Amino acid sequence: MQPMLNIALRAARSAGELIFRSIERLDVISVNEKDAKDYVTEVDRAAEQTIVAALRKAYPTHAIMGEEGGFIEGSGEGADYLWVIDPLDGTTNFIHGVPHFAVSIACKYKGRLEHAVVLDPVRQEEFTASRGRGAALNGRRLRVSGRKSLEGALLGTGFPFRDNQIDNLDNYLNMFRSLVGQTAGIRRAGAASLDLAYVAAGRYDAFWEFGLSEWDMAAGALLVQEAGGLVSDFTGSHEFLEKGHIVAGNTKCFKALLTTIQPHLPPSLKR
């Protein structure tokens, strides 16, 4: 395992242990609303602090971008490295006791994704990847599914629910209608990093969502790519981290999904 990936995995494990211990005291955990329907808990903040401390100890000059703590500037040659952290992806699930959430850590070098960890503290599943070295689950090599069409495919998605996404709800429902009849099912589980990890593991055949932040997608996207899948924004370009919308899947299902949803895109998502 690459040294940077090993450091990231150890940091994710520490955060995951903190999160898992917190499940038993959900009734007393402090919850705040950052924005409409966007929650943060003391556990999110503590988990991010744990990760940042581990990364800063190993790589004090690297830049860090965390969902809760914002941007920490790097210095010297270390500024070319950027760690992208979501300490608790699926906070709403966590708050409600739904056991589907994850720690997500990605490392970029000069803007390119290099390492990724998505850790599920409940199922003790550790999804890891390094550029050019493949993706793994608990040390076992991952490959995307071999399904050749959307017929019988299982898809993952995220349902628009925030106020700034409601204007696109009808477009999303049209996408849903065009897909639900030809697939085995569509799942909306509430943690994009895990959804993408499931694509990498072949559990989902493809995934799409809009209105995401970089920390929601970065680690999961590299997992899919290193497992042999494709990832893009809704126009088919590679600017998904910048644009905040993503399509991912095995080669065949990715292309079929992209072709199916594109006619239903609002103008704001066609750019």
Swiss-Prot record:
GO terms for biological process: inositol metabolic process; phosphatidylinositol phosphate biosynthetic process; ribosome biogenesis; signal transduction; transcription antitermination. Its cofactor is Mg(2+). GO terms for cellular component: cytoplasm. GO terms for molecular function: inositol monophosphate 1-phosphatase activity; metal ion binding; RNA binding. It is an enzyme of class 3 (hydrolase). Disruption phenotype: Decreased expression of T3SS genes and effectors. Loss of cytotoxicity against human lung cell line A549, avirulent in a mouse infection model. Down-regulation of flagellar genes and up-regulation of T6SS structural genes and effectors, increased biofilm formation. Grows less quickly at 37 degrees Celsius. Decreased susceptibility to antibiotics neomycin, streptomycin, gentamycin, spectinomycin, ciprofloxacin and ofloxacin. Increased ribosome stalling on leader peptide PA5471.1 mRNA, leads to increased expression of PA5471 and up-regulation of the MexXY efflux system. It is found in: Cytoplasm. Substrate binds at E67, L88, D89, G90, T91, R187, D216. Mg(2+) binds at E67, D86, L88. InterPro entries: IMPase, Inositol_monoP_metal-BS, Inositol_monophosphatase-like, Inositol_monophosphatase_CS, Inositol_monophosphatase_SuhB. The keyword Hydrolase applies. Induction: Transcription is strongly induced during mouse infection. Keywords: Chaperone, Cytoplasm, Hydrolase, Magnesium, Metal-binding, Ribosome biogenesis, RNA-binding, Transcription, Transcription antitermination, Transcription regulation, Virulence. It catalyses: a myo-inositol phosphate + H2O = myo-inositol + phosphate. Its EC number is 3.1.3.25. Its main location: cytoplasm. Homodimer. The rRNA transcription and antitermination complex (rrnTAC) consists of RNA polymerase (RNAP), NusA, NusB, NusE (rpsJ), NusG, SubB, ribosomal protein S4, DNA and precursor rRNA; S4 is more flexible than other subunits. Interacts with the ribosome and with RNA polymerase. Part of the processive rRNA transcription and antitermination complex (rrnTAC). The complex forms an RNA-chaperone ring around the RNA exit tunnel of RNA polymerase (RNAP). It supports rapid transcription and antitermination of rRNA operons, cotranscriptional rRNA folding, and annealing of distal rRNA regions to allow correct ribosome biogenesis. This subunit may play a central role in organizing the structure. Belongs to the inositol monophosphatase superfamily. This is Nus factor SuhB.
